[in-house]
């Protein structure tokens, strides 16, 4: 693991070498906006803003991207809920359960699924206020997602409205699926069949499909 230092909290980023190419720019950009972000009590806390940068990208085939961390108790790992109480991850687990036939489980974590990189476009928000830091993260978010798409085969974005224009900011040609948010009404997320579509797209590109059931804990 490599380390780089910041002028503001969290003061240090520990990162995997796969992120090396953009680290200097990330540090410069963050130091410009950090004081505005840190004026608020944040979700997640600053020490968890960059947690996913410790993860390798070379072995990832799919990025599952949400727009924002949970407005309370975010862990720095997108969609993660240690006590399995967050609606978003419960809806994701329910959908995967219906696809795979796994019925009895205690939790679900996309970070445990081989080949999948969970990501949030914005890395923090003010506690209780979703997308409240969107303006501050805008340039950094674009830099990081463009970097991620150089590694993955499929970008699966959760939120039709939030990600309507995402293709316009991507410089790397990447297969992009824009689906409903897991909490969308009338089970639109499940009807979307996004997880199945991702696997079809991988197979078309001669890549192994994702075993979504690996995210379950028992």
UniProtKB/Swiss-Prot annotation:
InterPro entries recorded:
Ura-DNA_Glyclase_AS, Uracil-DNA_glycosylase-like_sf
How would you classify this enzyme at the top EC level? hydrolase
Identify the catalytic residues. 68
Which SUPFAM superfamilies does this chain map to?
Uracil-DNA glycosylase-like
Q: What is its EC number?
A: 3.2.2.27
Q: Which GO terms describe its molecular function?
A: DNA binding; uracil DNA N-glycosylase activity
| The entry's keywords | DNA damage, DNA repair, DNA-binding, Hydrolase
The superkingdom listed in its UniProt entry is Viruses
GO terms in the biological process aspect are:
DNA repair
**Catalysed reaction(s)?**
Hydrolyzes single-stranded DNA or mismatched double-stranded DNA and polynucleotides, releasing free uracil
Family to which this protein belongs: Belongs to the uracil-DNA glycosylase (UDG) superfamily. UNG family.
- How does it associate, per the subunit comment? Homodimer. Interacts with protein A20. Component of the Uracil-DNA glycosylase(UDG)-A20-polymerase complex; A20 and UDG form a heterodimeric processivity factor that associates with E9 to form the processive polymerase holoenzyme.
Q: What is the role of this chain?
A: Excises uracil residues from the DNA which can arise as a result of misincorporation of dUMP residues by DNA polymerase or due to deamination of cytosine. Also part of a heterodimeric processivity factor which potentiates the DNA polymerase activity. Binds to DNA.
Tell me what this protein is called: Uracil-DNA glycosylase
């Amino acid at each position: 693991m490599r380390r780089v230092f910041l002028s503001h909290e969290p003061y240090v980023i520990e990162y995997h070498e796969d992120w090396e190419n953009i680290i200097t720019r990330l540090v410069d950009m963050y130091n410009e906006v950090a004081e505005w972000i840190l004026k608020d009590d944040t979700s997640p806390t600053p020490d968890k803003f960059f947690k996913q940068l410790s993860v390798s990208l070379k072995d990832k085939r799919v990025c599952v991207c949400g727009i924002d961390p949970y407005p309370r108790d975010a862990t720095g790992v997108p969609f993660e809920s240690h006590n399995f109480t967050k609606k978003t991850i419960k809806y994701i687990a329910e959908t995967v359960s219906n696809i795979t036939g796994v019925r009895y489980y205690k939790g679900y974590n996309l970070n445990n699924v081989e080949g999948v990189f969970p990501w949030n476009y914005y890395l923090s928000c003010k506690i209780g206020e979703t997308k409240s830091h969107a303006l501050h993260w805008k340039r950094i978010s674009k830099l990081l997602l463009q970097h991620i798409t150089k590694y993955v085969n499929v970008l699966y974005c959760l939120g039709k409205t939030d990600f309507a224009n995402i293709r316009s900011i991507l410089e790397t040609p990447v297969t992009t699926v824009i689906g409903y948010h897991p909490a969308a009404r009338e089970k639109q997320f499940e009807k979307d069949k996004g997880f199945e579509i991702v696997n079809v797209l991988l197979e078309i590109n001669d890549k192994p499909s994702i075993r979504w059931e690996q995210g379950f804990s028992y």
